[in-house]
From Swiss-Prot:
InterPro entries: Chaperonin_GroES, Chaperonin_GroES_sf, Chaprnonin_Cpn10_CS, GroES-like_sf. It comes from the Bacteria. Together with the chaperonin GroEL, plays an essential role in assisting protein folding. The GroEL-GroES system forms a nano-cage that allows encapsulation of the non-native substrate proteins and provides a physical environment optimized to promote and accelerate protein folding. GroES binds to the apical surface of the GroEL ring, thereby capping the opening of the GroEL channel. Pfam families: Cpn10. One of its GO terms (molecular function) is protein-folding chaperone binding. GO terms for cellular component: cytoplasm. It comes from Ralstonia nicotianae (strain ATCC BAA-1114 / GMI1000). This is Co-chaperonin GroES. Heptamer of 7 subunits arranged in a ring. Interacts with the chaperonin GroEL. The gene is groES.
């Protein structure tokens, strides 16, 4: 299934957290916090200004982003859990 977000919405796939600590202790899924980083899979065309022209988003497909713990709406697509969020819910783009 293909998703095309509307307006300033962004589709993000959470990145997996480490399931083992530095000392080798395995963290069970139930105790692990949800990761606050993800990869942008799709972006909408942007909000519209007063004249109806779209305002481009700052993020692009493939960006690694930081977002709040409770940001976005979780959706399941083809067995994969994704987040649909507004661009304003994204706090930063991770650069290497």
């Amino acid at each position: 299934m293909n998703l095309r977000p509307l307006h300033d919405r962004v589709i993000v796939k959470r990145l997996d957290n480490e399931t083992k600590t530095a000392s080798g202790i395995v963290i069970p899924d139930a105790a692990a916090e949800k990761p606050d980083q993800g990869e942008v899979l799709a972006i909408g065309p942007g909000k519209k200004d007063d004249k109806g022209n779209p305002i481009a988003l700052d993020v692009k497909v493939g960006d690694r982003v930081l977002f709040g713990k409770y940001a976005g709406q979780a959706v399941k697509v083809d067995g994969q859990e994704l987040l649909v969020m507004r661009e304003e819910d994204i706090m930063a783009v991770v650069t290497k």
